[in-house]
C-alpha cells in the first residue's frame, strides 16, 4: 500500500488508466474480429459495414492516444486488403 499521498493518487490513476486501456484493447479485438468473421462468411455488405466501423473507431483511438497513427492505419489497411478479396 502506498505511504504517500502522491503515491496513492498515482495508484488510483493507474487503475483508471488500466481499465480504460482494457476497454480499448477489447474493442479493438472485437472490431477486428467482426471484419474477419464477415469476410470468412463471404458477406461483402457486412464486411464493408464492419470495416467502416473499425476504421472510425481505430482513428478515434488515435485521437484518444491509445494507438499511434501509423498503427491504426496499418491495421485498417490490412483489414481493407482482406475485405477487397471478396470483390475478386
From Swiss-Prot:
Record GO terms (molecular function): small ribosomal subunit rRNA binding; structural constituent of ribosome
BP-aspect Gene Ontology terms: translation
Disulfide bonds: none
Keyword Ribosomal protein found: yes
Region (Disordered): 1-20
Purpose of the protein: Binds directly to 16S ribosomal RNA.
InterPro entries reported in the protein's UniProt record: Ribosomal_bS20, Ribosomal_bS20_sf
Keyword terms of this UniProt record: Ribonucleoprotein, Ribosomal protein, RNA-binding, rRNA-binding
Protein name: Small ribosomal subunit protein bS20
GO CC terms: cytosol; small ribosomal subunit
Family per similarity comment: Belongs to the bacterial ribosomal protein bS20 family.
Pfam families to which the protein is assigned, alphabetical: Ribosomal_S20p (PF01649)
Organism field: Campylobacter fetus subsp. fetus (strain 82-40)
Amino acid at each position: 500500500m502506498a505511504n504517500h499521498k502522491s503515491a496513492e493518487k498515482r495508484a488510483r490513476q493507474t487503475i483508471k488508466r488500466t481499465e480504460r486501456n482494457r476497454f480499448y484493447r477489447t474493442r479493438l479485438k472485437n472490431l477486428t474480429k467482426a471484419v474477419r468473421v464477415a469476410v470468412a462468411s463471404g458477406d461483402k455488405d457486412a464486411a464493408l459495414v464492419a470495416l467502416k466501423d473499425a476504421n472510425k473507431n481505430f482513428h478515434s483511438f488515435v485521437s484518444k492516444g491509445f494507438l499511434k497513427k501509423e498503427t491504426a492505419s496499418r491495421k485498417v489497411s490490412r483489414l481493407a486488403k482482406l475485405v477487397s478479396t471478396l470483390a475478386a
